[in-house]
């Protein structure tokens, strides 16, 4: 099969770029794979054909517009010159989605815009620079909402993949019958790289590096876009904990100055460690005791599954897409509401006060994560490709989480 992937970035670091990289890495072994992207890292270019797509790096809105135009023109030119004859053109996002017959959406743009307009997700405007970024963000969101609407309206001629049942429901709510053929394939996790045995190698090393003693309980958060992902709620929960030696490590980049000031206001600044983006997250999972992710909106949340694969108990909100994989109280804990700081503090206290519960929950989390390997994701994606090429009714194909995990519903506030 001749497969082309179109993605702004392809790497093994974070987000949609990681999903694309894992698919490319696996499918190129048995298929002819081409990659159209602005940047690519970690992929053996002897096994794939790479097309560099020119695009601006910033601002975000222009970066996506220029990539959309460039990739569309490049594919059109190659087609006119008869240089390509792809069976599948897979866009992992809305970048050049007009040229593709398979699309993976990692975000319901219309749902995110609804939350922003309702001020549930707050766009920061504390400085002139942030006001300019907010303007760019609104342009970017409007562009992607427009493209998303066009793509979903044409979904009868394309296969549209989303990464969680929550996203499937969001598309149905916003687009009605036009979204009926959407397919759910949850993201995977590298269960060898993210493994409980990493504690033997990295736990003491990372703790010493950041001045955390062996006896200090360590909470972990990882990701960008801290307002959307609920970092403020973790900081607000810290002073409510009975143990004063609980530390929080925040990995990622955002407005560190603001959140540092919030921590000072709550008198917990000395208990928080800010770490810029790390490409070795498995080392930090190994050093931590609990992974906390009280997100306001998260279509999936790769970091949740990575933490589970690492054997960590996870506390997250019910609106996270990866909450599909969690049975509350068995392999993780689900908050009543993302903004319920008292509930968050109580859940943390529950785990910190019971080492046996932490251990058992971490083991069950690992067992769940093992069901979501990237090999399985690649196989399910190939099933979609075959369905597209044979063109039977897409309605018959549904790739969801294991049936036993669907027995408990946890969607809500």
Language-model segments: what does each one mean?
Residues 17-22, 217-240:
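A conserved mid-protein helix/loop that constitutes part of the nucleotide-sugar donor-binding site
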Residues 225, 244-271, 275, 357:
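Short, structured helix-loop element that forms part of the nucleotide-activated donor/catalytic region
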């Amino acid at each position: 099969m001749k497969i082309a992937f179109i993605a702004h970035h392809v790497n093994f670091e974070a987000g949609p770029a990681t999903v694309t990289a894992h698919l490319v890495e696996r499918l190129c072994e048995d298929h002819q794979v081409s990659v159209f992207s602005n940047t690519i890292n970690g992929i053996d270019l002897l096994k794939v054909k790479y097309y560099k797509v020119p695009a601006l790096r910033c601002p975000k809105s222009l970066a996506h517009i220029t990539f959309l135009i460039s990739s569309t023109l490049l594919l059109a030119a190659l087609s006119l010159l008869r240089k390509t004859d792809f069976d599948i053109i897979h866009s992992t996002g809305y970048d050049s989605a007009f040229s593709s017959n398979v699309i993976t959406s990692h975000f319901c743009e219309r749902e995110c815009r609804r939350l922003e307009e309702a001020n549930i997700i707050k766009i920061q405007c504390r400085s002139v620079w942030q006001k300019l970024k907010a303007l760019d963000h609104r342009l970017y969101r409007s562009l992607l909402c427009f493209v998303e609407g066009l793509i979903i309206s044409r979904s009868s001629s394309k296969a549209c993949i989303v990464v969680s049942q929550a996203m499937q429901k969001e598309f149905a709510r916003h687009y009605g019958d036009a979204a009926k053929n959407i397919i759910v394939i949850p993201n995977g996790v590298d269960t060898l790289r993210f493994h409980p045995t990493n504690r033997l190698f990295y736990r003491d090393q990372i703790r010493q590096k950041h001045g955390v003693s062996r006896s200090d309980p360590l909470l972990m958060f990882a990701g960008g876009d801290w307002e959307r992902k609920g970092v403020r709620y973790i900081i607000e929960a810290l002073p409510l904990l009975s143990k004063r030696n609980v530390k929080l490590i925040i990995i990622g980049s955002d407005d560190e100055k603001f959140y540092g000031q919030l921590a000072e206001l709550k008198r917990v600044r000395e208990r928080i460690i800010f770490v810029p983006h790390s490409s070795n997250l498995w080392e930090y999972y190994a050093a931590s005791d609990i992974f906390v992710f009280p997100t306001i909106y998260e279509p999936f949340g790769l970091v949740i599954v990575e933490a589970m694969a690492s054997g960590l108990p996870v506390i997250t909100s019910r609106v996270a897409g990866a909450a599909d994989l969690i049975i509350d109280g068995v392999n993780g804990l689900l908050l009543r509401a993302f903004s319920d700081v008292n509930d968050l503090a109580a859940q943390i206290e529950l785990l910190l006060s019971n080492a046996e519960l932490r251990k058992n929950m971490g083991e069950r989390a690992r067992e769940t994560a093992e069901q979501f390997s990237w090999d399985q994701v690649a196989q399910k994606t190939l099933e979609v490709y075959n369905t597209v090429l044979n063109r039977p009714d897409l309605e018959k194909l549904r790739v969801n989480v294991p049936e036993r995990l669907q027995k408990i519903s946890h969607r809500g506030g």
